[in-house]
Structure formats: C-alpha cells, structure tokens
C-alpha cells in the first residue's frame, strides 16, 4: 500500500507541463483520464493542503461524484481519499523537517491543512510510527 503511494509521490514530482504532455499523449481509458485529472486537480493551487478539503467537495470540483472519485483512489493507491491526503500531508511535513529541522512544527502542520494539533500529531504518528519530537530527535 505504501509502495503505491511513494510511486505516486515520485510521479508527482514531475513538473506539471511534462505531466500534462505525457497524459495528453498516452492512450487512456476513462478511468485513467479521471485519475490523471484527480492528480492534476489536487496539485493545482495545492488543493491537498486545504483544511476544507473533503471527498464530497473535491468530487464536486471535478464534476463527478464521491463514489466514483473514492473508487479511483482505492483502485490507484489502495488507499481511501482521506488516507491518501493524510499521507501526502505527513510526507510533506517529513520532507520539510528533514531539510529544515528548526522549522516551527505547529506552523508546518497548519501549512499542510491541519487545524487541530491533536489530529496532526495523531496522523503523524500513524504514518511514521513516531511522534514529531521522536522524529526530530532521530534526524538531529
């Protein structure tokens, strides 16, 4: 499950123009087109960071429905929409802490879309297996 997520993460590091060109050139099924549209939409203006982001609101933005979009996440990542967004946010936090260990963790959690400290810490521990402080101690 995490392998699929990290493979997707690597693909997302491709600049938008190259990704859009690759998508346009490749023959795709309607499921592939939806998935490509989902990934581009999440990256556009960093929608994945929005605290208001929900499967329902995101599906509406795509002019689709929550079941179809949710199924696309399961099919392509073996994760639910919420799990994918959680991993994406925590992965951003981890990478930022590795490069800037002195950053204010509360501001960083807020930046990636967490309103509640307890939710951010719980999700960080769930994804990484350690608290943010334990993580910082390991990388220092």
Protein language model features and the residues they cover:
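The DNA-contacting recognition helix of HTH DNA-binding domains
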Residues: 66, 116-118
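Hydrophobic cores of alpha-helical transmembrane segments in multi-pass inner/ER membrane proteins
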Residues: 1-3
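Membrane-proximal linker segments that couple transmembrane helices to downstream signaling/catalytic modules
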Residues: 5-110, 123-126, 130-140
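ABC-family nucleotide-binding domains
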Residues: 113
């Amino acid at each position: 499950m995490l392998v699929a997520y990290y493979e997707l993460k690597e693909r997302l590091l491709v600049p938008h123009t190259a990704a859009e060109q690759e998508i346009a050139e490749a023959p795709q099924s309607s499921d592939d087109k939806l998935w490509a549209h989902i990934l581009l939409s999440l990256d556009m203006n960093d929608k994945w960071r929005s605290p208001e982001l929900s499967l329902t609101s995101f599906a509406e933005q795509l002019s689709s429905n929550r079941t179809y979009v949710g199924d696309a996440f399961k099919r392509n990542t073996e994760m639910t929409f919420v799990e994918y967004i959680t991993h994406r946010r925590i992965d951003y936090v981890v990478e930022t802490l590795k490069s800037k260990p002195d950053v204010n963790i509360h501001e960083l959690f807020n930046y990636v879309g967490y309103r509640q400290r307890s939710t951010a810490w719980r999700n960080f521990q769930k994804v990484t297996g350690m608290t943010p402080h334990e993580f910082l101690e390991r990388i220092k």
